[in-house]
Amino acid sequence: MNLKDPICAIATPPGKGAIGVVRLSGEGALEIAARVWRGKDPRRLKGGRFALGEVVDPKTGEAIDQAILLVFRAPRSYTGEDLVEFQTHGSPAVLRRVMEVLVAEGARPAGRGEFTFRAYLNGKMDLAQAEAVLALIEAEGELARRQALRALEGALSRRIEALENRLLNLLAHIQALLDYPEEGVEPLEAERTIREVLAEVEALLAQAKASRLAQKGARLALIGAPNAGKSSLLNALLGYERALVSPIPGTTRDYLEAPLELFGIPLVAVDTAGVRETEDPVERMGVERALGIAEEADLVLYVVDRSQPKPAPPPLPWARTLKVATKSDLPPAWEDPEFLPVSSLTGEGLDRLKEAVREALLGREGGEVLLTERQVEALLRARERLEEALSLPEDLMGLALEEAARALALLTGKEVAEEVVARVFQNFCVGK
């Protein structure tokens, strides 16, 4: 693949729309654009300027559509190359035809993520920022959007670069001590530096779960005895009536799912059948399914009616379970500080419960860092090498520190295999 030749792609989603965008980038992009454009010559436009005209078939002179043409000149463009965008009406037929004439004039259809790949190769962004582009495109919740934008703006890259520089400075100092002991080079507190870098790596890894949940979403299971108030609590969390509520125990015989966003996290809240001992085979199936849902959930709300005697707890994954005492507006039959009191009727305790859900899913840091699986692997490798370095004397820790610095460099793509880069960009859409 020639990474200088002109490429083109439809940059807007498939289907009909008010506006469609076709991108053209690479050597000769302005010349190709001039041949398919009737209006002000794109070659005469300054970067960041636009013109109104028509996209035409240069072989027949036939107009394809009225359009706006935008010119971005190298290196001040997304790709770092000369780049042209045609903004047409969002008709699939129009967009296909524009692509046809561009290809006929010498451009080739872009591969997946090739525009962003060229931006990476031309130094417009590092690999962590390129991954942030994809995360921003795919973001479904507000937290994922914030994470991706911060990474795209370089927040993670700057943090990693600072750690990498600390290790490289330490390596240089250790090497100077070994090579020129007679010069009296001041010894550096290597252990303290390594522990500080290790603490930063640990802090990043602590946010890996939050990053995954922000990007992929989480499942929240409501588990409890019949008539414990699970359906009412679900409706209160949603802010509208989704689940059927009845004073008759056992109203919910199967599970019910509803989408919910809390603190920017896309959740699927699952209201389950009441968990109790029963001879009814249908209800028993519902109970078994409820317990299975709890095992697979990212977080469980164990819901108990505080106005009634406390039941024996069911088998639940307690490490990721919050205990909720419902009907707190009624006189209590028991008190337990491990339970969060909530009234679905008055709303008392709902904000505290939501905050507890946020902290259980995201931790105290709040999950503002975007980390991909590839980046987490690199951080784990860096942590392993830093821990190894701590167990070695100064004159032997150099190799472990070099490998730790190299692992950190993988995050931003400074030292990364070609196949890894290809794997990152194969998940992109064609027009990006």
UniProtKB/Swiss-Prot annotation:
State the top-level EC class. hydrolase
Which keywords annotate this record?
Cytoplasm, GTP-binding, Hydrolase, Magnesium, Metal-binding, Nucleotide-binding, Potassium, tRNA processing
Q: Where is (6S)-5-formyl-5,6,7,8-tetrahydrofolate bound in this sequence?
A: 23, 85, 124, 432
PROSITE patterns, A to Z: G_TRME (PS51709)
Q: Where would you find the membrane-spanning parts of this chain?
A: none
One Pfam family name is MMR_HSR1
Residue ranges annotated for the TrmE-type G domain, each copy included: 217-362
How it assembles, according to the record, is:
Homodimer. Heterotetramer of two MnmE and two MnmG subunits.
Protein name according to UniProt: tRNA modification GTPase MnmE
Source organism (scientific name): Thermus thermophilus (strain ATCC 27634 / DSM 579 / HB8)
The top of its lineage is: Bacteria, Thermotogati, Deinococcota, Deinococci, Thermales
User: Gene name?
Assistant: mnmE
